[in-house]
Design a protein with these regions (language model features):
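A detector of single, family-specific signature residues
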Residues: 1-134
């Protein structure tokens, strides 16, 4: 499928994450080629999964998700839903957020961010996912 050996290695690392399929791994490789060469906050911001807080002086608005690469954010949504069901550490994180009273969409966005930051760390360290990673 992938002719270049370094791309095949990156593809194998991404598909080792439970919930991330082949198509999502390809989208990550295409839309975010710098993944693995930055810190976690920058990766989340580039994917559009870092909250932006609206505030000015004493006035405080709400935080929201905006900016970044929309196609990447759209591509990671369904794998986040799959990971909530089949990836035990991410399911535990989702359940903890919901038990704390957070809305479902916020918890899903947190899982999306966790997937991106985990993928970034795995590609940076050049190793596959293990259950203790998340």
């Amino acid at each position: 499928m992938l002719a270049a050996p370094h791309l095949k290695a990156r593809f194998d690392i991404l598909t080792s994450i439970p919930g991330l399929g082949e198509i999502t791994a390809l989208v990550l490789l295409i839309d975010m080629p710098e993944l693995g060469s930055m810190d976690a906050k920058h990766a989340a911001s580039l994917a559009g999964l870092a909250p932006i807080t609206r505030q000015s002086g004493q006035w405080r608005g709400k935080s929201f998700i905006q900016g970044g690469r929309a196609t990447l954010r759209q591509a990671i949504y369904m794998p986040a839903l799959v990971a909530i069901r089949f990836n035990p550490p991410l399911k535990a994180k989702y359940d903890a957020l919901r038990a704390a009273g957070k809305p479902a969409k916020l918890a899903i966005t947190a899982i999306m961010r966790r997937i991106i930051t985990t993928a970034n760390a795995l590609l940076r360290d050049n190793r596959k996912w293990t259950e203790t990673m998340a």
